[in-house]
From Swiss-Prot:
Motif Nuclear export signal location, chain numbering: 268-275
Record's subunit section: Homodimer.
EC top class named in words: transferase
Protein name: Pantothenate kinase 2, mitochondrial
Gene: PANK2
Family (UniProt): Belongs to the type II pantothenate kinase family.
Annotated positions of the Phosphoserine modification: S168, S169, S189
Source organism: Homo sapiens
Transit peptide residues according to the UniProt entry: 1-31
Length: 570
């Protein structure tokens, strides 16, 4: 045989006669000149396999005369494991003695270029080495499927996947191929409007997290959960949807109560909402924090972990229960900052509204039960605002813009204090029961007022006689202790906590020079007494300069912010 000039000076080539035309064709495409006297001999045992055809690999003359690629195909154990087994998966081209084409391409750049050209021809539908290319870019079904198998099994094939899809757009399906099979094989190869639409859908799917979409706010007293229920599920999506996902959606949306303590606030449901390109309803669910282990167990029973779900959670419980989520439910928690989620949630919910109604509202004539009105408020210019979050405790934030805010102060006397004291003083067992008792009580029998001390108003300092001078001040008297009812004690407790929060909020607003004060948090849920008292106190003590604002979804903003973080919505 003659030595081919363009190749390595120590390399000879040989190929079987049946493949000589294919080899000549490849060398011609590469621009390699082949002398007419070049001999193509039958293959040896250590030949290069390219999906059905064989070409002898380069042979290196060693001083000992031993063949470069091993003594025989049956004895290749002396080769390194990574050469015997390839690079993982099914290699595109392999030497029968165990060497991959990629390894040889590194040793011989010219051979590497030849093999690269062969891969390109295979991807363009040119068939196998030695098989004539069909005209007009058409390829046999066997060639296309072979290229697809290579791409699936080889890391290099995955890197060249975009090239394969673009090139395959010119191919024609094999006779007898089903329409569905053709559509799947040629996904993304259409050139009309349908192709653009399909590509956009696929792009959005890659950017969106997998269902289900949850946001969690695990507080000290209550857990708030928001769940997005997609309403635009296609027939194809429904067919591919796993049973555990269907079970979760049905369980959450078909029930109003979950066990003895879980509640879905149906009146707060946001309908026809668009999130991350999907249309659906946003559900709001709450349950006591002490039931969190039962919630985690339910997630395990419903096989949440098989859905690759990441729970975005905020609140102190995100740290407290992180290990339980991992060990019991096999679920990963993404812990988020509580105040960041709160700001994101309130701004987003205010922007989407409340099913055509205003999210924000205030009270007109709060001190007069007959004339008091709840009126909508347009928070179109929200900045600056003072945000008072009343949960178990209280945090007060000054918000100057979406990304510029600070925590001004807070207090430990919050909703948890009210409920805890009511449990001690009245024997109630639920927050709702405590509020119901407070609505029937009279706090003046418990508190010592200004008029109890001065006999009327304290005009010098502008203190009206009805103002509280000492919370629970009358309870120092044995006679008065015996005269009060549990309802009176509950009412006095509510007034005490609310007055303290209102006083701190007013001082913060004056110091920060902010006129809009927004009160949120689950302490205000179904708590009209506290809201009216806050509204009246701010208006009275500021002489009309401060306005107390409230929101319909008062306790769920942290959970909404966690959901937005899951979807990466600003």
């Amino acid at each position: 045989m003659r030595r081919l000039g363009p190749f390595h000076p120590r390399v000879h080539w040989a190929a079987p006669p049946s493949l000589s035309s294919g080899l000549h064709r490849l060398l011609f495409l590469r621009g390699t000149r082949i002398p007419s006297s070049t001999t193509l001999s039958p293959p040896r045992h250590d030949s290069l396999s390219l999906d059905g055809g064989t070409v002898n690999p380069p042979r290196v003359r060693e001083p000992t005369g031993r063949e470069a690629f091993g003594p025989s195909p049956a004895s290749s154990d002396w080769l390194p494991a990574r050469w015997r087994n390839g690079r993982g998966g099914r290699p595109r081209a392999r030497l029968c003695s165990g060497w991959t084409a990629a390894e040889e391409a590194r040793r011989n750049p010219t051979l590497g270029g030849l093999l690269g050209r062969q891969r390109l021809l295979l991807r363009m539908g040119g068939g196998r080495l030695g098989a004539p290319m069909e005209r007009h870019g058409r390829a046999s079904a066997t060639s296309v499927s072979s290229a697809g198998e290579q791409a699936a099994g080889d890391p290099e094939g995955r890197r060249q996947e975009p090239l394969r899809r673009r090139a395959s757009s010119a191919s024609v399906p094999a006779v007898g191929a089903s329409a569905e099979g053709t559509r799947r094989d040629r996904l993304g190869s259409y050139s009309g409007p349908t192709s653009v639409s399909r590509q956009r859908v696929e792009s959005l799917r890659k950017k969106r997290p997998l269902f289900p979409w949850f946001g969690l706010d695990i507080g000290g007293t209550l857990v708030k959960l928001v769940y997005f229920e997609p309403k635009d599920i296609t027939a194809e999506e429904e067919e591919e949807e796993v049973e555990s996902l269907k079970s979760i959606r049905k369980y959450l949306t078909s029930n109003v109560a979950y066990g003895s303590t879980g509640i879905r606030d149906v009146h707060l449901e946001l309908k026809d909402l668009t999130l991350c390109g999907r249309k659906g309803n946003l559900h709001f669910i709450r349950f006591p924090t002490h039931d969190m282990p039962a919630f985690i167990q339910m997630g395990r029973d419903k096989n949440f972990s098989s859905l690759h779900t990441v729970f975005c959670a905020t609140g102190g419980g995100a740290y407290k229960f992180e290990q339980d989520f991992l060990t019991i439910g096999d679920l990963q928690l993404c812990k988020l900052d509580e105040l960041d989620c709160l700001i994101k949630g309130i701004l987003y919910i205010d922007s989407v509204g409340f099913n055509g109604r205003s999210q924000c509202y205030y009270f007109e004539n709060p001190a007069d039960s007959e004339k008091c009105q709840k009126l909508p408020f347009d928070l179109k210019n929200p900045y600056p605002l003072l945000l008072v979050n009343i949960g178990s405790g209280v945090s007060i934030l000054a918000v100057y813009s979406k990304d510029n805010y600070k925590r001004v102060t807070g207090t430990s006397l919050g909703g948890g204090t009210f409920f805890g004291l009511c449990c001690l003083l009245t024997g109630c067992t639920t927050f709702e029961e405590a509020l119901e008792m407070a609505s029937r009580g009279d706090s003046t029998k418990v508190d010592k007022l200004v008029r109890d001390i001065y006999g009327g108003d304290y005009e010098r300092f502008g203190l009206p006689g009805w103002a509280v001078a000492s919370s629970f001040g009358n309870m120092m008297s044995k006679e008065k202790r015996e005269a009060v009812s549990k309802e009176d004690l509950a009412r006095a407790t509510l007034i005490t906590i609310t007055n303290n929060i209102g006083s701190i909020a007013r001082m913060c607003a004056l110091n920060e020079n902010i006129n809009q004060v927004v009160f949120v948090g689950n302490f205000l849920r179904i708590n009209t007494i506290a809201m009216r008292l806050l509204a009246y106190a701010l208006d009275y003590w500021s002489k009309g300069q401060l306005k107390a604002l409230f929101s319909e979804h008062e306790g769920y903003f942290g959970a909404v912010g966690a959901l937005l973080e899951l979807l990466k919505i600003p």
